[in-house]
């Protein structure tokens, strides 16, 4: 039965996405992280790195214990209630539909010829400056975001959800939220965010690399370039400043036949990141559509293979 929970959650996300009227649990994790930061930063006697470690432990521990308590309480109430709560918690941990909606908004603006609107929409997906991007720059930023978030927002929580249920998925979401809030190499967070960044790197190590296999499978199904996926990853994945993000980004670049990376601007400061991909194909609205299709098919493959392995394992343990 456990192997059915994640597919049910995935289907629910495809149908509903993230309801705007309901406060997403990730926001609660973010508020908890902000409160923990204020608490431990206020303890002046603590070294910043230790304060950051304690913050990460409190946030991750509280999140996992809360999720476990909700699931156990629901199952004690009724087995069906336990299943429903588990599926809902898993549903809130993944975001393929939300990623598709953001990518679609950028694509539709480009198709309509509204570059300014496209810049505004892609700014909701990336942290770089978007005000001066041309059409190709907007498309590149959107594709890079879809690629990276295929791992961060879909396959990684799928991986931990399949392995450890709702608690595993939310262990990952708490880690990822901490990294997005504190994992910066600036004066404020270089020491405080050290633990959050390192733990997120650890949590993403396997999922990011397994995502490459899913992208290659999706590229085969979509008649793109599965061989290009592996060539691109071999040549460029480790060049990325992140130990993990380069894998899905290089995989997408290879499958779509484009190059990602290059010059980016953050707060008015231009930064050059390594170029990923083998061919310099044009990037436009159509490329964004291709990236979103790749994301969906790769996610379904990842989930289906994981659920199948879990089913086989459960049957072998029963026999």
From Swiss-Prot:
Subcellular location: Cell membrane
Protein keywords: Cell membrane, Cobalamin biosynthesis, Membrane, Transmembrane, Transmembrane helix
Pfam entry (one): CobD_Cbib
Endpoints of the signal sequence: none
GO cellular component, one term: plasma membrane
Membrane topology, as annotated: Multi-pass membrane protein
Stretches of the chain forming a coiled coil according to its record: none
GO molecular function: ABC-type vitamin B12 transporter activity; threonine-phosphate decarboxylase activity
GO BP annotations listed: cobalamin biosynthetic process
Chain segments annotated as transmembrane: 57-77, 80-100, 152-172, 210-230, 294-314
InterPro entries (UniProt xref): Cobalamin_biosynth_CobD/CbiB
Listed pathway(s): Cofactor biosynthesis; adenosylcobalamin biosynthesis
Family membership noted in the UniProt record: Belongs to the CobD/CbiB family.
Function: Converts cobyric acid to cobinamide by the addition of aminopropanol on the F carboxylic group.
Record-given protein name: Cobalamin biosynthesis protein CobD
């Amino acid at each position: 039965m456990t192997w059915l929970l994640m597919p049910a959650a995935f289907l629910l996300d495809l149908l509903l996405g993230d309801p705007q009227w309901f406060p997403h649990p990730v926001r609660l994790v973010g508020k908890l992280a902000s409160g923990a930061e204020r608490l431990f930063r206020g303890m002046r006697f603590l070294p910043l790195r230790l304060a950051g470690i304690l913050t990460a432990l409190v946030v991750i521990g509280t999140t996992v214990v809360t999720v476990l308590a909700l699931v156990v309480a629901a199952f004690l109430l009724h087995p069906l209630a336990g299943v429903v709560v588990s599926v809902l918690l898993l549903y809130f941990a993944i975001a393929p539909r939300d990623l598709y909606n953001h990518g679609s908004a950028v694509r539709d603006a480009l198709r309509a010829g509204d570059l300014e609107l496209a810049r505004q929409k892609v700014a909701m997906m990336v942290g770089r400056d978007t005000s001066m991007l041309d059409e190709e720059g907007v498309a590149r930023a959107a594709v890079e975001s879809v690629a990276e978030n295929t791992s961060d927002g879909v396959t990684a929580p799928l991986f931990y959800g399949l392995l450890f249920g709702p608690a595993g998925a939310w262990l990952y979401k708490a880690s990822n939220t901490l990294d997005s809030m504190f994992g910066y190499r600036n004066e404020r967070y270089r020491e405080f965010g050290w633990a959050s960044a390192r733990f997120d790197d650890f949590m993403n190590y396997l999922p990011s690399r397994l995502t490459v296999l899913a992208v290659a499978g999706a590229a085969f199904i979509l008649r793109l370039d599965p061989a290009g996926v592996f060539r691109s990853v071999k040549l460029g994945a480790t060049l990325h400043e992140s130990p993990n993000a380069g894998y899905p980004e290089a995989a997408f670049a290879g499958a779509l036949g484009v190059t990602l990376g290059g010059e980016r601007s953050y707060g008015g400061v231009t930064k050059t990141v390594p170029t990923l991909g083998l061919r310099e194909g044009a990037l436009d609205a159509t490329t964004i559509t291709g990236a979103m299709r790749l994301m969906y098919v790769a996610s379904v493959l990842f989930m289906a293979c994981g659920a199948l392995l879990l089913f086989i394992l459960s049957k072998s343990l029963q026999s």
